[in-house]
């Protein structure tokens, strides 16, 4: 422990040593120059062989050299001091730059402790404090995920019991409970999505990822299911897909859930016999787009629509968690979710920008 404490230096100490070294070097240059000029002047005074005219000429020359000996070293020292101070500050603040790069390159889900790479006391203290903050945030997020999983798990059994009771009540008393049963089914589906999101979210935080081929593992397995869903309202599903597949780090099940929720949201808010277009762009990054032909959205409330329990229109079914789950899945994949109106014609445009291993976009 004693050796470690002695190895740790202070930023203030480094700054004082650097400035002290700069001042010492500049002062030595000035002293050497003045000593050289003083030696010439003393030699002139003791030289008796010079005539009066020669002495006056030499005196004038020495005066000019004395002025130059004061002004030129001062200018040189100012320039050298600025250059050396710049280099010293760069040397002292280099650990801060490394710390900034380490934090800037991190994703929102990466709460691993920062490595202690600096022997400067202040930098080590900041790194330790940030690591403590990461630990508290990680524990809070784990508690939130566990709470979500526990609540969702506790809701599954009573919801199944309520559904069974409604079916028996409908059979025995000839009462139409189909609308209530449909609501129960939607709640069960939402609970299962929350359970899935909580489980995979914990795996993501632990660093467990897999390589996902977006067309093969996400799009193709969902095409029949989504087409069957849209047939209930005679809606058409158009696919605009690239020829080549693209691979990213993530979870195929979560990405399928993201696609299902976006298409289901468009299906719910689009009129019958309308068209829903699903496009995948992989030129610069993975961008999934879902366009519908509904009434569009109020763009002043875009930030509210992706929050939990907020619905676009209370006339339609749903709990209001679909877009919130989409936002969370996009964040887990180091991506972003955007919702706006279509540029051409009525309808909404949902965009999910995801990252590939070699590309981290900053979408606007």
UniProtKB/Swiss-Prot annotation:
Residues 150-358 form the Histidine kinase domain. Residues 36-65 are periplasmic. Residues 1-14, 87-364 are cytoplasmic. One of its GO terms (cellular component) is plasma membrane. It is found in: Cell inner membrane. Residues 90-142 form the HAMP domain. Its EC number is 2.7.13.3. The keyword rRNA processing does not apply. It catalyses: ATP + protein L-histidine = ADP + protein N-phospho-L-histidine. Keywords: ATP-binding, Cell inner membrane, Cell membrane, Kinase, Membrane, Nucleotide-binding, Phosphoprotein, Transferase, Transmembrane, Transmembrane helix, Two-component regulatory system, Virulence. GO terms for molecular function: ATP binding; phosphorelay sensor kinase activity. Autophosphorylated. The modification Phosphohistidine is found at residue 153. It is a multi-pass membrane protein. The chain crosses the membrane at residues 15-35, 66-86. The keyword Transmembrane helix applies. Member of the two-component regulatory system PmrB/PmrA involved in regulation of virulence. Functions probably as a sensor protein kinase which is autophosphorylated at a histidine residue and transfers its phosphate group to PmrA in response to external pH and iron. This is Sensor histidine kinase PmrB.
